Amino acid sequence: TSQRSQHHLLHRRAEAGASFIVVEELHKGDARLAEIAERNNESVERIIGGCWVRWSGSMAWDRAGESHEDQTMFGLIPSDDSGRSGLLLRDRGYAEKAPVAGEFRMDEENGLILTTDYEMMSSLERFWFAGPNLRLRTSTVQGLSNNASFCMETRQLDDPAAAMAAASAGMPGALAPFGW
């Protein structure tokens, strides 16, 4: 689950919201990663993995019947042997419903930074862990709609014993490229 505070810079107003987000890790060789590579004119052999993200949410200013449900897939192509930076392939962007390529990098605090430039706008996101079951995310969008958001995302585990083990270990044993 995700709690979000979005700041609309043009209107000088803030809006609260919540989302339910599902992140599924995609391993090298997954047919869905091959599709992403083809759509972005990249070699599938270069993709090391990725994820499929689905979400459903609501914002305070929503009108009746307005929906914030969607999904996207990501594929990662590292730029060097460390794997800490490289090309981020999406089957479609947030702003445009066409395949888009951006960049990913891990910063010195192991935060994941995603940057994507679109025709009329650009986005910058940073993800990091504040605890074994708490991920934080900031994002800014510049261009047609200038806004900034901060999200607290709480991992929901199906198995209570796994939740206790993850909490006592301090961090999950294996993190997917986009967390959890």
Predicted features along the sequence, with ranges:
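Soluble ligand-binding/transfer domains with enclosed cavities or grooves
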Residues: 2-180
